[in-house]
Every structure is written in structure tokens, then in C-alpha cells.
């Protein structure tokens, strides 16, 4: 898991779409074993090949890397062939025996010797998805021998997440690394990869210097099993058979963190201050947690905690500690002294900033004296002429050339009655005339539909159903009808009708009118384009042709009541036999109390 020499913005290349994360980690793990390290071009060619392989039928789960290698074209660019060959070489066959489960060892028996590792034990097997989720760290059972397992990407990410909130060399940092070393039994190569993944290049260089110093001292002092003729300690620690030397190298690698030179800048825990209203015990608890995570291992914490508990406290707690003489007392005395302290209620004071006097210089916008330019009502002048029309009086955003041209509405014909009395202008309720055209625009008159007592508002229209030739007919304009009604004679051939319930003046009916869900075109005399309806009512008795609100709302019209020149006539009112309310239920028999009880008083 060494560094990748390239220009990739992230240390982990992104997986191609459609490929599982654990499969992509297997390919990355094999690519990182190449010498020299893979480049960005190699990862780009690997992603391109995997995108093509995902579309083939041999892409199964688990992946057969032998079949996958047969798909690589001859002379394919990059190092894809080497990466696939590493996976083919280390692929676990389905018939391989399962790993033996370590049995618990009794105190009276001696532990069995560990099986001899294979010569290629440093090569990790392909990643297998675990059946149950496990959390880092995982400790081995007591007495069970630890088996070497190289790092996987998810292991390195888990370790880095654990130490991300701890300072370098702190107890939490060192405890996490000890658990990782105890669990994975890493070699010298694995420890170097872990160091490069967790720390910066400067820390890696300093750790390398301290580790070389400790190794030289250990080789001079002598170690059990160390043979100077077999090579340096780092090389002998990579041998899986040398368990003792590997343990010694791991301890030296951990000890190199405690001997790193301290940081020159102030640590983060030195900047922790007590708030104005923060309790003293909460402030000391924050200091204690920060020192546990930030102090190097072996550094005494108690004197630093006592010093910061006084120097970083607020002024009121410092005055209390000074008055009691506990500026450098044990921490328990300081906590008991300040435990009864509570922040005083601060008197709220309204701070009003006085307004600056107006300037004596003239405003650069309007040239007047007595106000600031930000308060000037004059708009900001443009810096120069408009680049579109060369007019210096407006900005480019206000240029009239940028405004879209106004679309002219469709001219409507005028359908006025022939009587001369209807052409007189009428004054509206709040002033103005009936028609007030703009002087700069053409007059566009909406259709006027008269309503007279002598005759019904009937228009001559043409109706086309299902793309047939429009047929002329007389239609009644009814603003109280929700849907348009046409007779069945206008519909050519048999069509599919739907039952519907109609509520009219004479009650409910579900036999005379049917619902026709067929496109309908209505040609009105005052409109050039036809009115298109998706459905309408069909009169099976062929009595009614009604233009309802669904058609009238598409053509903006105006209903008016013309003046009747004849004198008014008083006619007797005859109550009809059926008024259309017979279908409603009878009203409830409930006594009605007077709304105003005070009105019934004498």
C-alpha cells in the first residue's frame, strides 16, 4: 500500500460504475503490489477494461479471474495484464479446505506448534465479503497464536478513522496502533505502508530516523534469534518464521513514536478557555479529555492540568481561586472552591452607535450637500454609453433592445346586436368606459354576447367530432353548464359511451346524457381557431346543443344585458310544480333558538 506516483487528486482511485466496492479493492490491492508503482494511466486503463468486462455474460459473483484474463485484447495498453495475473495466481479455489478454528488451550497442555507458513504468505488472498459485520479492533482469544494478515484498504481506513481525533504519540493513538499490531501481526513492509497512510511525509521521515537509531542500539545490544550474517533486522522481520524478531521490530516501531521531537507550535489543548457562563467543572472536564488525547505517552498530566485549570479560567473563577489561595492547589480543592460559583446576571445595556453627521462635500450622484451617497435617491449613473444602442442615459440591463417584443393577441371579431341602443358607452362602477384601448395599440374587441328576455343567447356554430367535416348547428350559450352538450346525431357511427350522473333543474338523470371521451372541435363565429375539448356530454334524445363553461373559458367573452326600450310589465308569478329540490332530504326537525337572546327580553 505504498504511495502512488501520479497526478491523481485522491489516494484511492474511484471505482467504475456497476462494480462492487470489495471487488474494486481486490484490483487495487493487486495493483499496489506492482514494482514500480502503478501510474494514473494504469488505473485509467484498468477502469476502462472493467467497464467493458461488466457487460459480458461471464461476469459472475465470485469473479473468475482466469476467464477475466482471457478477455484482455492482445497488446492492451497499461499494466492490466499484470494486475489480473496477480489475482489469478492468488485466487482461492472453491475446493480449498477451510481454515482451522483455533481450539482453546488448557493450562496443563502445551500449545501445538503453528503450521509452517507457505513461502508466499505475504501475498493477501482476494477479499471475501464477511457474513457478519465486525468492528475494529478485534482481539485474538487468549493463548491463540496470531496469524499474519496483510492490510486491506478497509483495515487502513478503520485505523485512520480511530486515530483521526488523537494527537501523534498520545495514549489513544498508541493504544490503537498496539491493537492493530496485535491483530494483524504485520511485517516491516506492512508497518511502513501503515505509516505512509496515516502520517505526513515529514512525520514519516522523522520516524524513519528514530527507528534506525533504535534498531542500531538493539543490534548492538543483541537480541534473541538475531543473526548479523543473515541481513539487517528489517529483512529478518519480514520472514514469517522469525516470530521473535518480528515482535522485537514491532516494539521498536512503536517506540519510535514516543521519541519523536515535539511540535514547535502550541498544542490544541493550550487554547481551551473557560466561557463566561460555563461551569468550572465542565471546563476542567474538557481540559482533561484534551490532555488525554493530546499529550505524548509518558508525559505527566497532573501539573499541566492544574496550571491550565487556573490560567485558562475566566476572570471570576480566577478571583475566587486567588481569594482562597488555591492557585496551585490540588485539582480537587480547586473544584470544591468553584463548584458553588454561578455566572452573575449581566445587566443588559443597549449600545447605540451615534449617527455620523452628514458630509460637507457634495454627493457624486446628484451634486447636492447634506446626505451620504448611499442614501441618495438618484440612481447610479452608468459608466458610459450603452454598448448596444450607444445611449449614455441607461445601463445595458435596461436597454430597450434586450426586451422581447410583445406578442400581438389574436384579433377577435365583434358580434354585436343590430339595435343601436347597445352601442352606447356605459360607465363602469369605479369610472372608465366599457372599452378603453391604448392610443398606441390597435383596438382589440372581445366578443360581446347579449342576453335578452325575449330570446335566448343562441349562436350558429360548427362542430366536428373525430376529425369529420364540421356540421353547422344552433347552440345555446349556458354559463351555468359545466360541460358542453351535443346531440347524438352529430357523432358518426357507434362510439363508446360512459354512464354519468347529471344534476339539473329537474333533478338527477343518468339515462339521457352520456359521457363522450373523444376530441371535439367547435368553430365559433367570433373566433378564428376552433375550441378543442377532450370530452363532452352526449344527448341521446337529440334535444340539446349547449356551449358550456369548458368551451367559453377558452375564448374570452363578455356577457351584457342590453337596455330594453319597452316598458316593464308586471306578470303574475306562478309556482312551478317541480322546482328541482325534491331530491334533497327533508330538513331536520330541530327547534331553532333566537340568535339574539337579549331581543326576547321584555
UniProtKB/Swiss-Prot annotation:
Q: Report which superkingdom the organism of origin falls in.
A: Viruses
Where are the CCHC-type Zn fingers located?
361-378, 384-401
Query: Coiled-coil regions in this chain?
Result: none
What positions does UniProt annotate as the active site of this protein? 478
Segment Disordered: which positions? 94-121, 399-425, 582-602
Lipid tethering residues (N-myristoyl glycine):
2
Q: Which InterPro entries match?
A: Aspartic_peptidase_AS, D_retro_matrix, Gag_p24_C, Peptidase_A2_cat, Peptidase_aspartic_dom_sf, Primate_lentivir_Gag_pol-like, Retropepsins, Retrov_capsid_C
Q: Where is the composition biased (Pro residues)?
A: 97-121
Disulfide bridges in this chain: none
User: What's in the keyword line of the UniProt record?
Assistant: Aspartyl protease, Capsid protein, Eukaryotic host gene expression shutoff by virus, Eukaryotic host translation shutoff by virus, Host gene expression shutoff by virus, Host-virus interaction, Hydrolase, Lipoprotein, Metal-binding, Myristate, Protease, Repeat, Viral nucleoprotein, Virion, Zinc, Zinc-finger
Q: Where is this motif: PPXY motif?
A: 124-127
* UniProt name for this protein: Gag-Pro polyprotein
The organism named in the record is Human T-cell leukemia virus 2
The record's gene field reads gag-pro
Amino acid at each position: 500500500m505504498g504511495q502512488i506516483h501520479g497526478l491523481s487528486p485522491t489516494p484511492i482511485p474511484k471505482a467504475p460504475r456497476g462494480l462492487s466496492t470489495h471487488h474494486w479493492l481486490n484490483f487495487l490491492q493487486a495493483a499496489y503490489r506492482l514494482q514500480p508503482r502503478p501510474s494514473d494511466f494504469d488505473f485509467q486503463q484498468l477502469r476502462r477494461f472493467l467497464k467493458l468486462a461488466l457487460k459480458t455474460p461471464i461476469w459472475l459473483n465470485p469473479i473468475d479471474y482466469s476467464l477475466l484474463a482471457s478477455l484482455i485484447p492482445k497488446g492492451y495498453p497499461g499494466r492490466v495484464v499484470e494486475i489480473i495475473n496477480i489475482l489469478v495466481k492468488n485466487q482461492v479455489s472453491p475446493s480449498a479446505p477451510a481454515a482451522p478454528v483455533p481450539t482453546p488451550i488448557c493450562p496443563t497442555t502445551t500449545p501445538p506448534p503453528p503450521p509452517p507458513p507457505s513461502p508466499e504468505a505475504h501475498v493477501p488472498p482476494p477479499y471475501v465479503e464477511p457474513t457478519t459485520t465486525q468492528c475494529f479492533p478485534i482481539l485474538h482469544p487468549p493463548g491463540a497464536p496470531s496469524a499474519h494478515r496483510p492490510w486491506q484498504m478497509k483495515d487502513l481506513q478503520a485505523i485512520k478513522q480511530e486515530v483521526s481525533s488523537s494527537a501523534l504519540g498520545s495514549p489513544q493513538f498508541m493504544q490503537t496502533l498496539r491493537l492493530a499490531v496485535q491483530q494483524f501481526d504485520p511485517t516491516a513492509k506492512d508497518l511502513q505502508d501503515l505509516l505512509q497512510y496515516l502520517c505526513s511525509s515529514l512525520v514519516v521521515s522523522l520516524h524513519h530516523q528514530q527507528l534506525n537509531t533504535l534498531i542500531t542500539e538493539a543490534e548492538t545490544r543483541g537480541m534473541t534469534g538475531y543473526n548479523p550474517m543473515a541481513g539487517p533486522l528489517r529483512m529478518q522481520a519480514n520472514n514469517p518464521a522469525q516470530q521473535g524478531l518480528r515482535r522485537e521490530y514491532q516494539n521498536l516501531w512503536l517506540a519510535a513514536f514516543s521519541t519523536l521531537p515535539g511540535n514547535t507550535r502550541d498544542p490544541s489543548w493550550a487554547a481551551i478557555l473557560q466561557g463566561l457562563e460555563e461551569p468550572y467543572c465542565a471546563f476542567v472536564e474538557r481540559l482533561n479529555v484534551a490532555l488525554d488525547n493530546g499529550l505524548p505517552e509518558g508525559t505527566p498530566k497532573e501539573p499541566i492540568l492544574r496550571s491550565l485549570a487556573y490560567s485558562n479560567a475566566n476572570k471570576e473563577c480566577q478571583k475566587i481561586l486567588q481569594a482562597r489561595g488555591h492557585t496551585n492547589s490540588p485539582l480537587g480543592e480547586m473544584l470544591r472552591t468553584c463548584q458553588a460559583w454561578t455566572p452573575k446576571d449581566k445587566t443588559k445595556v443597549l449600545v447605540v452607535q451615534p449617527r455620523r453627521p452628514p458630509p460637507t462635500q457634495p454627493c457624486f450622484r446628484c451634486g447636492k450637500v447634506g446626505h451620504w451617497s448611499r442614501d441618495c435617491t438618484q440612481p447610479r449613473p452608468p459608466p458610459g454609453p450603452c454598448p448596444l444602442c450607444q445611449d449614455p442615459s441607461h445601463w445595458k440591463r435596461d436597454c430597450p433592445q434586450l426586451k422581447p417584443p410583445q406578442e400581438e393577441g389574436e384579433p377577435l371579431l365583434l358580434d354585436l346586436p343590430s339595435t343601436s341602443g347597445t352601442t352606447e358607452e356605459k360607465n363602469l362602477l369605479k369610472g372608465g368606459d366599457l372599452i378603453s384601448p391604448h392610443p398606441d395599440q390597435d383596438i382589440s374587441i372581445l366578443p360581446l354576447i347579449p342576453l335578452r328576455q325575449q330570446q335566448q343567447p343562441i349562436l350558429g356554430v360548427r362542430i366536428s367530432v373525430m376529425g369529420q367535416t364540421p356540421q353547422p348547428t344552433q347552440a345555446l350559450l349556458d354559463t351555468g353548464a359545466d360541460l358542453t352538450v351535443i346531440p347524438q346525431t352529430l357523432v358518426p357511427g357507434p362510439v363508446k359511451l360512459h354512464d354519468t350522473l347529471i344534476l339539473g333543474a329537474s333533478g338527477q338523470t343518468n339515462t339521457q346524457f352520456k359521457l363522450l371521451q373523444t376530441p371535439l372541435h367547435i368553430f365559433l363565429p367570433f373566433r378564428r381557431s376552433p375550441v378543442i375539448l377532450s370530452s363532452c356530454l352526449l344527448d341521446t334524445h337529440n334535444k340539446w346543443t349547449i356551449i358550456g363553461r369548458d368551451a367559453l373559458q377558452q375564448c374570452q367573452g363578455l356577457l351584457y344585458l342590453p337596455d330594453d326600450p319597452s316598458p316593464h310589465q308586471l306578470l303574475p308569478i306562478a309556482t312551478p310544480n317541480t322546482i328541482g329540490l325534491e331530491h334533497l332530504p327533508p330538513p331536520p326537525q330541530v327547534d331553532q333558538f333566537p340568535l339574539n337572546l337579549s331581543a326576547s327580553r321584555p
